[in-house]
Amino acid sequence: IGNGAKFSHPSPHQMTMQLTPTIAIHMSAALGALALGPIALWARKGAKQRPMIHRAAGYAWVTLMLVTAVSAMFIRDFKLPNIAGYTPIHLLVPYTLFGIFGAFLYLARKDITAHKKTMQRLYFGACVTAGAFTLLPGRLLGSLVWGQWFGVL
């Protein structure tokens, strides 16, 4: 920096101080959903389908996504562009809730193709894409990963 000041990364202690119980619950549920999603999607692929695994992993994934979406409403950020602390990434909350509702509605109507497409979109949109956004510099997880673990920032 031009004035001779050094940029320093927050210490692990400082990062932990920012990790509130709400953020810890949100992050744990999101990481669980990110890991479990492929199992639920995989169990219905190929010649040998595994409906029990698909159903168990699917219900667990839906539960984790509901926890992730609801807990996100209690996490607000006033530094980024926001409305009352809600940033653009919060738009994934109604996307997730309506998507899960729609996926179960498709199941009730026995429209398996629409159910499958909805769940795939939810996984890649609400898990993978949202996860990528959390790794941006300046966000808690991004600062932890890029600054503390890899020392890039």
Where would I find each of the regions flagged by the language model?
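Alpha-helical membrane insertion/targeting regions
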Residues: 1-153
